[in-house]
Amino acid sequence: MSERDSPVGEHTKEPVNDGQEQEYEDAVAAADSDHDSDALSEVDEDQFEDYDPETANIEDRPVDIDEDVARTLKATKRKRTEGEAPKKPREGRRDKKRRDRDEDVEMDDAEDGSKKSRRSRRVAVDGERRQKSKAATPEPENEDHLSPEERRKRAIDRALDAAIKKPSGQKRKKKDEIDLEAEIDDLLADLKVRMEGACQSDNQAREAGQPALHKLKLLPEVTAIMNRNNVQHEVLDPDTNFLQHVKFFLEPLNDGSLPAYNIQRDIFNALAKMNIEKEALLSSGIGKVVVFYTRSKKPEPSIKRIAQRLLGEWSRPILNRTDDYKKRQIETRDYDYDAAKMAQRQKTNSQFSLSQRPAPNTKEAERERLLAPSRGNNSARMVNLPSSYTVAPQSTFMGSQGSGHRPLGAGGMEAFRKMTQKSKKRAN
């Protein structure tokens, strides 16, 4: 018999009521009653002997209201008492102070006008701007009745219209109405004059036996203007022709020595980041200097690698070649096996000596002997052949014409045939 089925186990699970909970509840009730009795014991009962609730003066007593009289009443303001002060009128929401760009322009006119005139002019400009913005932005249409696809199409159309109407290529100006493009042109013109003067000063210093330091001093300004993204168009403009003076910096000096390594490294790194077009290359002539650095043995290997990479990138647009491997045009030629075999046979016949070749006539043999080139003991050195193919080779292998050619699946068929033969032999 298990403990679950035994009556002893059932008796142990029941809660034991020893009277403690009842005693606790009685104690709590007695405490509450004592608290109430203590509060009432402080009240004097003699005060309430003559109390009559009907005659008592109670302010909160409900009053009977005549509905007909209440309908005739009108809404009026509550009368203020003698000591009550009137309330201040509530102020409306103040506008936030906005600082527009026009303030910078108006600062120049501070000497001519006063503060009041500036403030009135600013308010007028703000009013005109707000009116233009309100007129330019039409009210949005209600698109609740449209389907999600039509809403999406309208949103795309609005985005395209906004992109088309957005003004692009505006003339950049400063706050004081100075044209930035004209300033950049003046900066490049001044820098070109100083670069040319630095090259001439370095040549004169080398002729005098002194170190060439003028281009090194001007190098930070040159690299800074070449690495600025916002002036790339002006630097690469063929009319400005700034790259021609960069070529002067990279050219060897009059004594044949190359410019300093810092000049080569910084300028080549800056040229590698630029997207130079064909017109700029032709007008500046910087490609000739890059070709010189690829063929000369004086530059460092790192400079030579950058020059070779630049030469490959710049020669593609000139030679009308693309860097896309899929669009490459590979030169191929048809191979005539019979013609090649005939040419090989004629070549082998021409290599025979007079004694080995059958001479049909003595006159022809004498003529060939006189016309044969003289061979000395010192043979000429063989010219190195090109390491890559100029014409792509074509494979002439035909797998189906080979002696050991087997079609696809022939091995499986042969194995199946052997299995059937074995089964026939066993059956016999």
From Swiss-Prot:
Residues 1-151, 346-381, 393-412 are annotated as: Disordered. GO terms for biological process: poly(A)+ mRNA export from nucleus. One of its GO terms (cellular component) is nucleus. Keywords: Nucleus, Transcription, Transcription regulation. InterPro entries: RNAPII_TF_IWS1, TFIIS/LEDGF_dom_sf, TFIIS_N. Residues 39-53 have a biased composition (Acidic residues). It is found in: Nucleus. Residues 244-321 form the TFIIS N-terminal domain. Residues 1-16, 58-71, 81-94 have a biased composition (Basic and acidic residues). The keyword Oxidoreductase does not apply. Pfam families: Med26. Residues 346-359 have a biased composition (Polar residues). PANTHER family: PROTEIN IWS1 HOMOLOG. Transcription factor involved in RNA polymerase II transcription regulation. May function in both SPT15/TBP post-recruitment and recruitment steps of transcription. Belongs to the IWS1 family. This is Transcription factor IWS1. It comes from Gibberella zeae (strain ATCC MYA-4620 / CBS 123657 / FGSC 9075 / NRRL 31084 / PH-1).
